[in-house]
């Protein structure tokens, strides 16, 4: 348990209104307590860690100066919002983040009135905040709207689309965008000149001159004097920082400012609150600030399991091979014999298992940053020239490049292999990161071949099969580990569109897809039912399905995808096209966005673990229950 006597100031803060009761001179002490509390609480529970440590001062400054929740803060991605949650009535629950029934890992509108926009994917904040600012302007509402976006999220085109729109509007919306630059990707250093410039561009004097000039000379580009003054200011600032881009897009740029210097932050924000039109504040922060180990390993401490802050993360010993590990090994093995192979990732080198490949084949590795649309069309272009690109991407992020998959890859039947990680139920990261829809939205695309492995060995074979197939292919595999079937070192392929009969039985045929083959087989063998590892969602094994339809009374399809339009729907469509009338029971994920919990709990909740499949069968066919087949035997 956390001893709140160690946090005398933080213990007095339940809402931002309580924070505003402190004197400015006390905020440094509040920040120190908040940072230490974050370290202690996340150490107990696990969760996103380093990003939140980097925005402690910024979060305090925003809630201190802005009248939240009337003024609206829109956070991008959400990894950095633990301090925000702590200051907005959720301090005592922060250790429940990512746990079933606990706080969401990202901002969630249903959770708090201070969470103005739900998020989990990157680069949405400016668009959402602009929408809010436009409505406020139309309603004559003086509320302030602030978007907080990291420099990583600024690699996505959507952010620039929003900046371009906001900066070109007339009348101009009152919108503040805060660029949280924690990787020095925009400014290489915060030296003396840039510090001086940050103070100057954020000063009342310069802004008074600028605003006075607008009133005297006008703000139109056709006014020669105003145009000259604007160009002079841009030239002066452009010598020191890359502000010209934002200024050209119609934003008044302030910064860069040290994001851990509370007086500097407060001073700049006080000035910016008085200005009209689109504003951009550039702050420099350190991810993991205040915890030396996190500052030194920002990737390793991005998201953590529970740990002792006094000792830091302890490297795990030998662990069971994950599906991501299988992909990682296959990719390097295939690259060794196939010079055409090129690998692409949208900023997920570690998560998608590309670290080893990037080290062994740096000239064949392409990290395009958070740019899923570009990643897929880049792969399409490579394929037109005879290369075989492999796009390693999470299922949830593939949604962002769906048009490119359809229009640029599938329509042209280009040889692109999609290694779709985190398919199906994902777990603690919640609805924003779930892969519950991919079988549905991939199955309907013409020319697309789609596979889902039942185990690790099959995953490797499917990747090889997809690599050698002529046309677009997706191999969709889950987060975490599988049954433990060790893959061979060979690069064997599977016959396309051929399922695997796992067990011959009577009456009922259980058709399992991907991870659902294991519970289907566990239950089917116990009850004497036929069990099939379908392997292919598209094309389905037509020959086997027609044979089973002639010899069985009913089909039961089992998949970790929403039932609507999923793999089971494909089976029903095939039988319908053949004029076969046969009862089909579809077991899968619900028509709902599942919330955060462990994968095991979510699979059980959906009724597609072994116990759930068993219960579903007995509810429809009670005669299957015999003394030797108790529910507890398969739970």
Curated annotation (Swiss-Prot):
The UniProt record lists the keyword Transferase: yes
UniProt cofactor note: Binds 1 Mg(2+) ion per subunit.
GO molecular function: 1-deoxy-D-xylulose-5-phosphate synthase activity; magnesium ion binding; thiamine pyrophosphate binding
Sorted UniProt keywords: Isoprene biosynthesis, Magnesium, Metal-binding, Thiamine biosynthesis, Thiamine pyrophosphate, Transferase
Pfam families xrefs: DXP_synthase_N (PF13292), Transket_pyr (PF02779), Transketolase_C (PF02780)
Cofactor requirements of the protein: Mg(2+); thiamine diphosphate
Residues that bind Mg(2+): 151, 182
Entry EC no(s): 2.2.1.7
InterPro entries: Dxylulose-5-P_synthase, THDP-binding, Transketo_C/PFOR_II, Transketolase-like_Pyr-bd, Transketolase_BS, Transketolase_C, Transketolase_CS
CDD domains membership: TPP_DXS, TPP_PYR_DXS_TK_like
Enzyme's top EC category: transferase
Top-level division of the source organism's lineage: Bacteria
Annotated positions binding thiamine diphosphate: 79, 120-122, 152-153, 182, 291, 372
Function: Catalyzes the acyloin condensation reaction between C atoms 2 and 3 of pyruvate and glyceraldehyde 3-phosphate to yield 1-deoxy-D-xylulose-5-phosphate (DXP).
Subunit structure: Homodimer.
Protein name, per record: 1-deoxy-D-xylulose-5-phosphate synthase
């Amino acid at each position: 348990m956390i001893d709140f006597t160690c946090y005398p100031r933080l213990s007095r803060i339940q809402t931002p209104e309580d924070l505003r009761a402190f004197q400015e001179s006390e905020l440094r002490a509040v920040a120190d307590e908040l940072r230490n509390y974050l370290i202690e609480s996340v150490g107990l529970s696990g969760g996103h860690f380093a990003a939140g440590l980097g925005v402690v001062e910024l979060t305090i400054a925003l809630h201190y100066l802005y009248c939240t929740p009337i003024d609206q803060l829109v956070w991008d991605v959400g990894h950095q919002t633990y301090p925000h949650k702590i200051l907005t009535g959720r301090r005592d629950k922060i250790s429940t983040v990512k746990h079933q029934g606990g706080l969401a890992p990202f901002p969630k509108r249903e959770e708090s009135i201070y969470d103005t926009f739900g998020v989990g994917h990157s680069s949405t904040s400016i668009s959402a905040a602009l929408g809010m600012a436009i409505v406020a302007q139309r309603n004559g509402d003086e509320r302030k709207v602030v978007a907080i976006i990291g420099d990583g999220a600024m690699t996505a085109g959507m952010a620039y689309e929003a900046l371009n729109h906001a900066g070109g509007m007339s009348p101009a919306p009152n919108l503040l965008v805060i660029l949280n630059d924690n990787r020095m990707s925009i400014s290489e250093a915060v030296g003396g000149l840039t510090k001086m410039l940050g103070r100057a561009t954020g000063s009342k004097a310069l802004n008074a001159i600028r605003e006075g000039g607008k009133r005297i000379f006008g703000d139109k580009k056709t006014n020669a004097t105003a145009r000259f003054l604007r160009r002079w200011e841009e030239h002066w600032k452009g010598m020191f920082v890359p502000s010209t881009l934002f200024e050209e897009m119609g934003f008044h740029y302030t910064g860069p400012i040290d994001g851990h210097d509370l007086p500097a932050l407060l001073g700049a924000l006080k000035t910016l609150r008085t200005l009209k039109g689109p504003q951009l504040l550039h702050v420099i922060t350190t991810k993991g600030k205040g915890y030396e180990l996190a500052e030194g390993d920002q990737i390793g401490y991005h998201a953590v399991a529970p740990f002792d802050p006094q000792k830091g993360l302890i490297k795990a010993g030998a662990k069971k091979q994950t599906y991501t590990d299988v992909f990682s090994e296959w990719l390097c093995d295939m690259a060794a014999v196939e010079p055409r192979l090129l690998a692409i990732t949208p900023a997920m080198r570690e998560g998608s298992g590309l670290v080893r490949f990037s080290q062994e084949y740096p000239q064949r590795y392409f990290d395009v940053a958070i740019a899923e649309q570009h990643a897929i069309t880049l792969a399409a272009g490579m394929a037109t020239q005879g290369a075989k690109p492999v796009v390693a991407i999470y299922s949830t992020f593939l949604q962002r490049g769906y048009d490119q998959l359809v229009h640029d890859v599938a329509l042209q039947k280009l040889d692109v292999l999609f290694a779709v990680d985190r398919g199906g139920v994902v777990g603690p990261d919640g609805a924003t990161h779930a892969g519950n829809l991919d079988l549905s939205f991939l199955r309907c695309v013409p020319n697309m071949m789609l596979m889902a492995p039942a185990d690790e060995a099959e995953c490797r074979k499917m990747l090889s099969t997809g690599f050698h197939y002529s046309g677009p292919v997706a191999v969709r595999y889950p987060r975490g580990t599988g049954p433990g079937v060790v893959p061979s070192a060979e690069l064997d392929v599977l016959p396309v569109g051929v399922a695997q009969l796992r067990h011959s039985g009577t009456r009922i045929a259980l058709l399992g897809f991907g991870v659902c083959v294991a519970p289907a087989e566990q239950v089917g063998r116990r009850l004497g039912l036929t069990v099939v590892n379908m392997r292919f969602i598209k094309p389905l094994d037509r020959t086997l399905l027609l044979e089973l339809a002639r010899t069985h009374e009913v089909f039961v399809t089992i998949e970790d995808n929403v039932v609507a339009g999923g793999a089971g729907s494909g089976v029903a469509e095939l039988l319908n096209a053949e004029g076969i009338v046969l009862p089909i029971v579809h077991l899968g994920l619900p028509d709902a966005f599942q919330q955060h919990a462990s994968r095991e709990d979510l699979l059980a909740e959906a009724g597609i673990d072994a116990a759930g499949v068993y219960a579903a069968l007995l509810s429809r066919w009670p005669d299957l229950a015999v003394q030797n087949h108790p529910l507890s035997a398969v739970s």
